[in-house]
Swiss-Prot record:
Homodimer. This is Transaldolase-1. Pathway: Carbohydrate degradation; pentose phosphate pathway; D-glyceraldehyde 3-phosphate and beta-D-fructose 6-phosphate from D-ribose 5-phosphate and D-xylulose 5-phosphate (non-oxidative stage): step 2/3. It comes from Cyberlindnera jadinii (Torula yeast). Transaldolase is important for the balance of metabolites in the pentose-phosphate pathway.
Amino acid sequence: HGIHCBTLL
């Protein structure tokens, strides 16, 4: 979670 993986996680 945080920058660009927020949508995957």
